[in-house]
Each structure stands twice: as C-alpha cells, then as structure tokens.
C-alpha cells in the first residue's frame, strides 16, 4: 500500500487545481478536478436515493443507502482492507426498489426520454411473451437498444415496433438497422451516436443494471432477456404500484421519494440472483 505522503503526491500530481498542465474535469456544482470526479462516480447513487451530497456539505446516507451498505462487512487490519459479503439479498432488494422508481428524466439528470426503464422493459417482455407468434423467450439482446432509446413509457407502441422489426429481420437485424431505428426513427436524428455504443456498450450496461434487481434473467445462452418467474410476485407488485408515477422538480423531494422504503416490497422474500 502507498504511504500517506505517496498518496498525497499522487493526488496532487493529478489535481488540476495544483497541476495547471492538467485540463481537468468539471461537474455542475463541484470544483474542477477530484471533487467533480467524485460526483461523476457517485451521482448514480444519489439518483437512486442511496446517498445525498453537495459540495461543502456532509454526506448523508438514506435508509436504503444504509440497507445497501449492510450488504458487506469491511475490516481494516494494519492498513489492509478486507471485505466480506454478509447480506447478499440486501443488494438485490435495494436496487430492485431503486430501479422500480428511477425516472430517466429527473431533477438530477434531465433527459429527453421520459420513462422508468425497468418498468418499460418488464411490460414489453410481458407483451412479447403473451404473443402467440413467439415462443415466450422474452426480448432479444439485439432489441434492447430500442428499450434504451424509447422516448416514453408506451410499452404497447414499443412492443408493436419490435414485432415489425422481427417481421422484417427475424431475430438477427444488422447493427446498422438498429442504429437507424434508434437514432433516426426514435430520436429524429438530432444527435449522433457511436455505433458500438448503441449496439454493445449501452445494452451491456443496461442489462447489467437490470439484472441487479433479480427480476430478469438470461435465456438462450444470453441471446434473450426474460422475466425471472421466481420473482413474479415482486414484478406484479412493481407494475401495479410504480407504472404510473409523479414527476418531481425539486432534487430534495425526488431524493426523498427514491430513498423512502416501500415496506410491502421489502417484505417480499428475496430470491438469490443466479450468476
């Protein structure tokens, strides 16, 4: 491990406030450099209602944040830090509630897309699985970009667009077809995106987050994303209680909403997430 002096030297050499040759990184409300990088790394934790912070003020963990933190036990012995997972179910339940509530357009992050991604995903999978034209295997990984780029919470229209995509290209549309639908058709071509981001990076990150809830699982060797039917009670509860949501303009009110524990949802038994 680094000594205190070595650690200080590393930070200073990479701090644009000290080393003027470094351009630095700037986030709104935070000074350029390490403070802004802190916000970049932890902003999602604020958006999900786990921890609230502002520059120059104390960092506050919410109830759900403390619940998530209790997933692990951390020991420090002679400068060595060890971590042990002691309550794995806490992580699943905390992220399940957070993603069930998370609005893409919120006071912390303003986006053109206005929906709750987890709910949109669950609803469109249910519609696809109920369609007699298909085999009930969920949504294709290649179709996930449409969920990510979809501008509203209209799962029926998204389902119909996926049906058309399957009619025209089966389950194997080209990357360029997906790019055209997402960028030109859905977003109207107002912004350019890297092709690899659309068909690989964004879907990988999205699916990884959704799997943290324990509500979805892979099928067909990872080619399809389906509902985890071991969690049908939770899924039905979430769709019944969170599909319709209130919009917030205040960061504090939105954070309070996100961090408030839903006792009924937390009371439902967690099923271990398959690896």
Name every feature range the model reports, one short phrase each.
Residues 1-275:
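Donor-sugar nucleotide-binding helix/loop cap in glycosyltransferases
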């Amino acid at each position: 491990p680094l000594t205190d002096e070595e650690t200080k030297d590393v930070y200073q050499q990479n701090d644009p406030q000290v080393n003027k040759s470094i351009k630095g990184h700037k986030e709104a409300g935070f000074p350029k450099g390490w403070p802004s990088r802190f916000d970049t790394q932890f902003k999602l934790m604020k958006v999900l209602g786990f921890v609230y912070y502002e520059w120059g003020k104390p960092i506050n963990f919410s109830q759900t944040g403390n619940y998530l933190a209790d997933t692990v036990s951390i020991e420090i012995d002679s400068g060595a830090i060890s971590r042990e997972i002691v309550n794995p179910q806490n992580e699943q339940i905390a992220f399940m509630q957070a993603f069930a509530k998370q609005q893409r357009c919120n006071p912390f992050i303003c986006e053109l897309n206005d929906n709750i991604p987890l709910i949109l995903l669950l609803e469109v999978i249910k519609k696809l699985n109920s369609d007699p034209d298909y085999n009930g295997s969920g949504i294709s990984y290649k179709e996930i970009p449409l969920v990510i780029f979809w501008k509203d919470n209209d799962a029926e229209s998204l389902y119909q667009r996926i049906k058309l995509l399957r009619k025209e290209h089966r389950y194997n549309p080209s990357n360029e077809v997906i790019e055209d639908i997402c960028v030109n058709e859905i977003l109207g071509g107002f912004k350019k995106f890297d092709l690899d981001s659309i068909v690989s990076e964004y879907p990988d990150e999205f699916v990884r987050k959704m799997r943290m809830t324990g509500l979805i699982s892979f099928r067909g060797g990872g080619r399809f994303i389906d509902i985890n039917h071991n969690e049908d009670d939770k899924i039905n509860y979430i769709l019944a209680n969170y599909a319709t949501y209130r919009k917030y303009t205040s960061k504090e009110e939105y954070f309070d909403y996100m961090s408030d524990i839903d006792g009924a949802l937390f009371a439902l038994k967690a099923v271990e997430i398959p690896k």
